[in-house]
Amino acid sequence: MSNRKYFGTDGIRGKVGDTPITPDFVLKLGWAAGKVLARHGSRKIIIGKDTRISGYMLESALEAGLAAAGLSASFTGPMPTPAVAYLTRTFRAEAGIVISASHNPYYDNGIKFFSIDGTKLPDDVEEAIEAEMEKPLTCVESSELGKASRIVDAAGRYIEFCKGTFPGELSLNGLKIVVDCANGATYHIAPSVLRELGAKVIAIGCEPDGMNINEECGATDVRQLQARVLAEKADVGLAFDGDGDRLIMVDHLGNKVDGDQILYIIAREGLRQGQLRGGAVGTLMSNMGLEVALKQLGIPFARAKVGDRYVLEMMQTKGWRIGAENSGHVILLDKTTTGDGVIAGLQVLTAIVKNHMSLHDLCSGMKLFPQILVNVRFTGENDPLEDKSVQQITQDVEKELAGRGRVLLRKSGTEPLIRVMVEGEHEETVIAQANRIADAVKAVS
């Protein structure tokens, strides 16, 4: 992979007010992106955002930079990331830009791009944008400046698109669903989709104030959702992250259902319906239980690097149509071009309705192995993963697992973290082993 200065695995991200998430940087980024994208002919860009208070500031900066490069911006307002990908395709825009830091706290924000076909920008285009950033900013002639406009009923367009992925002969009548929108971009989308399909919806995490996005709610913290599902005696709960590209579910007993289990349900249903093409793609973090369960069904399984862009790349290479991360990014290429929490949820609900089974029962064919993830923050210049003591302890743990588990150490693509994952048959042992490795990483971080 190339050494890009600003772009990580999911665009550009950081703390608001610190480089690169500053108004001047984002203005320059908009200009540089405009210069690169204008070479392809179209001069229209779609811009969406989540509900962070900083979105207004960054949206204005992006628009100014694009206009200076001669490109026009069409705004969606607060909108899920996958909605921007969809609108980019339907409006035949040269690119879509999302202002979001996904599951991060409100004081972070980020910028990510979609190409004209609704997929993430290729590495070479991101590299070209970074190269343009090194040049002095110049403004086009006044007659060539870009304009700004707002897309009429962007939410309604996307709601109808989502509903179109649910079988027309079915409805959600009789289902009680709790939905947690993380005070994020799905707050005005997901409840409407589910209600219009017939469900009784209890909505939480749907009162964004600019600073409560992902705060003890949504896909990264389902405790509120679990409690509400039990209190309401609901059939199922759906939790999205701040920008709506992740889905975590909760069954009627209050059990969390993660991206691995969601992928299993969708793959199994695709096989049952005779619609599964090839196999399923997970990641290095996918639970061994998923691999075992799919193998029992005769469904091929492959692991990509962590990051939804790498899941998508492997899906495209293999010609497979479904893939997911255990964090809840679920990509269904027969339905859309990127991870989409609402659409993934609708496919699981389809399986519930068609099979007359609860979410709990749909998960019963897959047994999760205990998996412990410890995040260790590092600030030093030395790479903890290259340290010999860390490597030795990791090797010792791998020997102890003796092929009945896995160890994975990796750097986060979006934060200064080392992620330590240990997976095995016995939870107490796995916890102790993960902490041993994490302590070794901390000692050299």
UniProtKB/Swiss-Prot annotation:
GO terms for cellular component: cytosol. Its EC number is 5.4.2.10. Keywords: Isomerase, Magnesium, Metal-binding, Phosphoprotein. Mg(2+) binds at residues 102, 241, 243, 245. It is an enzyme of class 5 (isomerase). The modification Phosphoserine is found at residue 102. It holds the Pfam family PGM_PMM_IV. Its cofactor is Mg(2+). Activated by phosphorylation. It comes from the Bacteria. Belongs to the phosphohexose mutase family. Catalyzes the conversion of glucosamine-6-phosphate to glucosamine-1-phosphate. This is Phosphoglucosamine mutase. It comes from Pectobacterium atrosepticum (strain SCRI 1043 / ATCC BAA-672). The lineage of its organism: Bacteria, Pseudomonadati, Pseudomonadota, Gammaproteobacteria, Enterobacterales. The gene is glmM.
